[in-house]
């Protein structure tokens, strides 16, 4: 039985675990990687596998009308992201941990700090529904995703620096204060 890995976030996983991407991918027959999630390329994914597998994938892509003109431009963006942005992924992890630590201290929010291992922070809103919380944050310029009735997901990335995290925390504190008023 062949195994495929959705490796969209493999770059962050490798940095978080302190191991090469190849070590993560080794048990799989194929994997897909994404150059825009985490690395910050404007667009682009790649399929990795044996020569036979890739030849078959190319044939299917062609049969279904898939294809990319000027693929070199996309490849250049992906290569730039690999060469210039991979090393800074640890910054995203650090900011995620800092964000989570601050969230953990806020009344009306709950986060398991042990689960914050990369650039994604999942936490719970106990002061209101996740949708109401996310909507109130969005109205103030902060974009996060609700997940279930109380869950919220925040993601740190290339375009989120320390000042942005501070601003996000201020908005969250403001939303919680308004909910208590």
Language model features by range: what are they?
Residues 1-125, 131-140, 144-160, 164, ...:
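Conserved PLP-enzyme active-site core in the AAT-like
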């Amino acid at each position: 039985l062949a195994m495929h890995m959705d490796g969209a976030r493999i770059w962050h996983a490798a940095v978080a675990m302190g191991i090469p991407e190849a070590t993560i991918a080794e048990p799989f027959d194929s994997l897909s990687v994404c150059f825009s999630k985490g690395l910050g390329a404007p667009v682009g994914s790649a399929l990795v596998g044996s020569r036979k597998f890739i030849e078959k994938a190319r044939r299917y892509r062609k049969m279904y009308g898939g294809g990319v003109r000027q693929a070199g431009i996309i490849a250049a963006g992906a290569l730039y992201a690999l060469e210039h942005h991979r090393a800074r992924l640890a910054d995203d992890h650090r900011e995620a941990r800092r964000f989570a630590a601050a969230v953990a201290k806020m009344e009306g929010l709950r986060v398991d700090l042990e689960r914050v291992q990369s650039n994604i922070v999942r936490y719970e809103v106990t002061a209101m529904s996740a949708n109401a919380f996310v909507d109130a944050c969005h109205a103030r310029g902060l974009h996060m995703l609700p997940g279930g009735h109380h869950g919220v997901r925040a993601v740190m990335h290339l375009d989120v620096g320390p000042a942005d995290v501070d601003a996000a925390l201020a908005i969250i504190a403001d939303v919680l204060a308004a909910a208590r008023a």
